A protein has these predicted regions:
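Extended hydrophobic leader/signal-anchor segments used for secretion and membrane insertion
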Residues: 1-157
């Protein structure tokens, strides 16, 4: 499906209360959602979205799954969500509650499904996110050091 057709089908399924499963594309979510992994999205009411959730929404550039950084309420009562990909340094353009379609509830990695609808609410999600980022940073540092020969294992050990 092209982007517009996928967007239309996704909107229809989620609006009807169905879950949506698809292959993620791109690298903006770093280690949380990798390019080519299967993700499952469940419909969500904007009032049930918390900071730390990965939401699926319609944006000016098409469908997007990014993490909620902040929830902002305007004086007129309109709610907007500041999103960012885990591998990004800057927030995306804020999205309105009407642009949210669902929340990513699981990701399939190497044949195993990982539940992202964590118990423990926002604190649990923040701990999970911190652990993912720490693991990614450690892996990156290990690769960088390993390429310089600093972390070479002694074969005699």
């Amino acid at each position: 499906l092209d982007r517009n057709a996928f967007s239309s089908v996704a909107d229809s399924l989620l609006a009807a209360g169905f879950k949506l499963r698809f292959r993620a594309g791109g690298h903006s979510m770093g280690s949380a959602l990798r390019d080519g992994e299967r993700v499952t999205v469940a419909p969500v009411d904007a009032r049930d979205v918390d900071v730390g959730d990965i939401v699926f929404c319609q944006t000016w550039r098409g469908p997007l799954a990014h993490r909620v950084q902040r929830i902002e309420q305007a004086a007129a009562g309109a709610v907007r969500f500041a999103l960012r990909g885990d591998a990004s340094f800057e927030d995306d353009r804020p999205v309105a509650a009407s642009q949210l379609r669902g929340r990513v509830i699981s990701v399939e990695r190497n044949g195993r499904a990982f539940d992202l609808a964590l118990r423990g609410g926002a604190l649990g999600r923040r701990i999970f996110v911190a652990a993912l980022r720490a693991r990614a940073a450690l892996a990156s540092a290990t690769r960088a050091l390993g390429t310089r020969g600093v972390l070479v294992r002694d074969p005699a050990a």
